[in-house]
Each structure stands twice: as structure tokens, then as C-alpha cells.
């Protein structure tokens, strides 16, 4: 059996430059949760289907459970924690989810919010049908 291999990953997470050694087989979900305690990134299906682990990487939403941590080298990563204001206040999109009772059980809500953030920040216009097809 071979020994684990590690690689230094340098990236920006929620606006802060970070460096960490990661197992080359580790997912970005594992790195964010285990190394940085970013618990908004949930482990759900671990096959890229449920969206509970969604994060924004260089402006695009990805399932972090199927994105290797080593691929994050040089990237700008945002999790739900990046949306909080300086005094912990919720962002407009987070407040809208609360106001519209769009939280369900809450487990996948952070990932759904990050998908919504990508849609809003992309500047693209989508029909309700297009958004509905992309929703879980």
C-alpha cells in the first residue's frame, strides 16, 4: 500500500490568502471543512448531485465534493461565510431566503444560496423554466 501524497495548495478563501498541505485525493469539501472549519459547505451525496456543497470558484459555482482540493491552487473560492457583513449581518440574498421561507430543513440551503449568488452575479438573464430545470 502506498503512502499518502500531499501537495501545497495556495488559494484565496473568502477574501483571505491561504496555504495548506492537502492529501492529493482530498475533495475541496474536505479541505474547506477540515482545514478551515467552513461548515456551510455540507457533505451530502458526495457525487455532485445534491448541491449541498456548492461553492463559487473564480465566479462559477461548483460541487466541491467532486472538485479535488489540489485543483483549488491559485483559485479564488467563496463559501456562504463570505456573504456575511462585517458585523455578522446577513446578505440580502440570505435575508430573502428567510423572508420567503425558502430554507426547507436547512441542510442544502447554503449550497442553494451559493447557486443563486452565481446567477445574480453572472449578469445573465434566465427564465423561470431555466432556473427550475437547474434547481434540485
Spans of features found by a protein language model:
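Signature of N-terminal electron-transfer/Fe-S-associated modules in redox systems
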Residues: 1-135
Amino acid at each position: 500500500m502506498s503512502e499518502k501524497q500531499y501537495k501545497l495548495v495556495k488559494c484565496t478563501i473568502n477574501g483571505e490568502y491561504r496555504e495548506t498541505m492537502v492529501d492529493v485525493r482530498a475533495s475541496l469539501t474536505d479541505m474547506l471543512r477540515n482545514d478551515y472549519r467552513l461548515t456551510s459547505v455540507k457533505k451530502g451525496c458526495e457525487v455532485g448531485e445534491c448541491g449541498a456543497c456548492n461553492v463559487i470558484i473564480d465566479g462559477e459555482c461548483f460541487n466541491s465534493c467532486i472538485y479535488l482540493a489540489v485543483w483549488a491552487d491559485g483559485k479564488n473560492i467563496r463559501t456562504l461565510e463570505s456573504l456575511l457583513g462585517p458585523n455578522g449581518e446577513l446578505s440580502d440574498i440570505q435575508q430573502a431566503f428567510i423572508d420567503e421561507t425558502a430554507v426547507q430543513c436547512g441542510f442544502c440551503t447554503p449550497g442553494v444560496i451559493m447557486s443563486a449568488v452565481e446567477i445574480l452575479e453572472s449578469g445573465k438573464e434566465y427564465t423561470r423554466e431555466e432556473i427550475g430545470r437547474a434547481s434540485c
